[in-house]
Amino acid sequence: LDSHPVLHRVAHDPAVKALIAAPILVCTVDHLTPATESQRGGRQIAPMLRLMSGDLVLDEPDDFDLDDLPALTRLVHWAGLLGSRVLLSSATLPPSLIQGLYDAYRDGRLHYQRNRGVAGAAVNICCAWFDEHDRAHQDCADSESFVAAHQRFAEQRAARLGKAAVRRRAQLAPLAASSRRREEIASEFAAQVMGHARDLHREHHTVDPDTGKRVSFGLIRMANIEPLVEVALALYKGGANSDQHVHLCVYHSQHPLLIRSAIEARLDQALNRRDAMAVFRLPDIRQRLDARPEPDQIFIVLGSPVTEVGRDHDYDWAVVEPSSMRSLIQLAGRVRRHRDGDCARANLVLLNTNFRHLAQPEGPAFCRPGFEGRGDWLLRSHQLETLLGEEEREVIDARPRILTRPDLRPRESLVDLEHARLQRCMVAPPAAAAPDTADVPLTPRERNKRRKAEAPAQLGAYTWYGLPRASLTAVLPQQQPFREDTTKRVDLVLMPDDSGERYELQQIWQERGRRAPLYVEIDASLHHRIP
């Protein structure tokens, strides 16, 4: 970059230099989304240049929240606009999400070929599908041909999944509370999930070859962090049976990064089960097993949705608080992940409802995370026994996610709710896909009549490329931002004292108009020093 006549102007910034110059760039998507969000001058230039010079690989794009899909669509559209290729990697890609991203890419590619390709050439996009069993490819000139090709591949994959050995079997368990008070709900919730954990441990343990103790590693997944902490305290207070010892690890995304990194390092070692007996040779596990006399040793990870993706962990069993079908599928993939063979007895317990419904039974329950909302998206029931069919909940795999039913019932089915919301967000309705009529001359009377007759246009992810000249302003990035976060955050730092032997917790205070930050010592009443 230093010798380039233009790019040498940004070579002084190490972050920009790394983003542009790296032959292979591995980064989170928030480094690239500014390419389409030019609200502040200059922030879009580096990711634009990166997309111009490389292809785009998106891992687990269906893991994004509904509110983030417009930004993801803008990024894929921009990749097509710049002539890049796009690879989507996930085992649970729903049809509407794929169709919406294809339509966005095709629209961008159309503009690219008009300016950089052969004049008048058809937009025939080479599309390919891969999984561990098969591969397929087809040139798709329009959305209809792409949808048909994708449907064929998804149906073949679903057929193979139906014949595969069943490594995860689920059973539905009731969840009830005698009060709406959060403290009592947390206490009863903890008692019930602990009972399920004991039952699953009894069925799915491994015998320690050195001591003969029965050992299992399980996961209790909860949807939200605040009730998770309350349940963790209730579990700690409740204790365990005299012949059992519970090793509890609380794992969520709001840990300080240093603590979260230490937790993940230990979990990565303990939950690598490719060699079933290797875990008993780990010093940390060995020390914990030898230190306790109880014959049953239960290792439990009480985790938030951060446990579902991103880590290659293998649990013996899991207890799941539901929030969406996608989360159930992703979490089920963490049970016996490294071990083959059929499972005869249930190793997953699905709670019939969740903590949020027990606390607020009149409102949406499967939301934040989840797809439920108010109005058209409010489920008529919040019990999995009515929201999921028997075949959908007994053997959990990707089939409900990769295929959709012709007639969706989003208020009666948790699976249909996800497909319907994705379809509304990603796929343009016929009116939104109509040709541009903005330049058709109209009389004032005709214009007024049309304005009264037309309903306000609904914003979707497709609005970016479907609405004429929408990209000329920053209105859509402002209305549909990527990962909008209104949480007030405080930056803390451990600063050494004058002796260099002790560290003091201080807050980084940045005043407007001041370049250098201030470091303000945190009051002793707000934190506790661990000896």
What are these regions (language model features)?
Residues 1-26, 41-43, 47-48, 52-55, ...:
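Conserved C-terminal RecA-like helicase domain
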Residues 30-33, 44-82:
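SF2 helicase catalytic motif II
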Residues 31-34, 63-66, 94, 308-309, ...:
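Residues immediately C-terminal
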Residues 61-64, 75-104, 333, 352:
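Conserved helicase ATPase motor motifs in RecA-like P-loop NTPase domains
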Residues 88, 98, 102, 107-228:
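Conserved interdomain linker/interface between the two RecA-like ATPase lobes of SF2 helicase motors
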Residues 185-213, 217, 223-241, 245, ...:
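The feature captures the C-terminal accessory region of ATP-dependent helicases
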Residues 285-291, 301-315, 333:
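SF2 helicase motor core recognition
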Residues 317, 324-348:
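Conserved SF2 helicase motif VI
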